[in-house]
């Protein structure tokens, strides 16, 4: 692109109340210090990302795409204290919501990452939703309250199955909370990412995953189809490792996170590390 069309580090970023440009750094999750070897990055001003989003949505419609997604929309929210274009956090929310509505006006679905409450009304799909809490050892059990409120109204998924810490665990958590399955793939071999800062995609090569992906997705889709558009009416733990999620259409999803088979009081067998969907009489 022309020089005037690219990113301008003095014009496009948001500014702190001190008028300094918002330039951020990555920090270690282990020792909490700044990672000097990583490049810094800028936080775009709401006005700048609005212009980019409008242009992208227009072109997406032109090329006949089904939907769009921006990494930070609905997830990251910041004000801009630039004296010449001050934008408050509430105004930034309005700007993002206007963008969501613009995508609908252009017959485009909108997908967001993780997501905040203000974005829920106008988006179609949420990825990387936290399905199983923060895993603090002090917690006994977890209740998928957020998913209970949203299921049947919005589509959502947890972490990418192929990038998760344990594929089976990710699927079990999805079944418990009524989430969809989410995968992240790339065409090239993950070997090209060795000795880079993108090693989290260690298991993203589509050719390596194709058969497993198809099998996992078909099985999950067939099992969960009866409750896909239903609302959740109840969630309970039958023991420390087995949960039961009930839906308004009479179906129940039993999930066994343990390594021993479990039989319910009514005689339903829930195999270890598996889930079943059924109408319990």
Task: Please state what every model-predicted region is.
Residues 2-281:
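Active-site-proximal substrate-binding groove within the catalytic cores of carbohydrate-active enzymes
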């Amino acid at each position: 692109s022309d020089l005037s069309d690219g990113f301008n580090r003095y014009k496009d970023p948001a500014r702190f109340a001190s008028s300094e440009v918002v330039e951020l750094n990555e920090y270690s999750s282990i020792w909490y210090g700044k990672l000097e070897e990583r490049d810094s990055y800028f936080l775009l001003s709401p006005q700048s990302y609005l212009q980019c989003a409008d242009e992208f949505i227009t072109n997406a419609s032109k090329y006949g795409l089904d939907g769009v997604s921006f990494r930070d929309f609905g997830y990251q929210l910041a004000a801009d204290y630039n004296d010449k274009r001050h934008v408050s956090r509430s105004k930034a929310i309005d700007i993002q919501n206007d963008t969501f509505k613009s995508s609908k006006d252009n017959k485009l679905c909108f997908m967001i990452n993780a997501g905040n409450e203000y974005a829920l009304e106008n988006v179609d799909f949420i990825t990387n939703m936290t399905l199983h809490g923060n895993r603090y050892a002090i917690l006994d059990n977890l209740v998928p309250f957020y998913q209970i409120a949203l299921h049947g109204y919005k589509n959502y998924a947890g972490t990418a199955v192929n990038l998760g810490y344990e594929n089976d665990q990710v699927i079990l958590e999805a079944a418990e909370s009524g989430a969809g399955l989410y995968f992240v793939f790339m065409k090239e071999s993950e070997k090209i990412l060795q000795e880079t800062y993108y090693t989290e995609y260690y298991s993203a090569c589509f050719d390596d995953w194709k058969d497993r992906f198809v099998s996992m997705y078909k099985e999950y889709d067939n099992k969960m189809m009866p409750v896909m558009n239903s609302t959740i009416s109840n969630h309970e733990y039958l023991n420390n490792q087995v949960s039961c999620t009930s839906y308004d259409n009479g179906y129940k999803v039993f999930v066994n996170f343990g390594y021993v088979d479990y039989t319910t009081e009514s005689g339903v067998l829930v195999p270890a590390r598996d889930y079943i969907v059924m109408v319990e009489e």
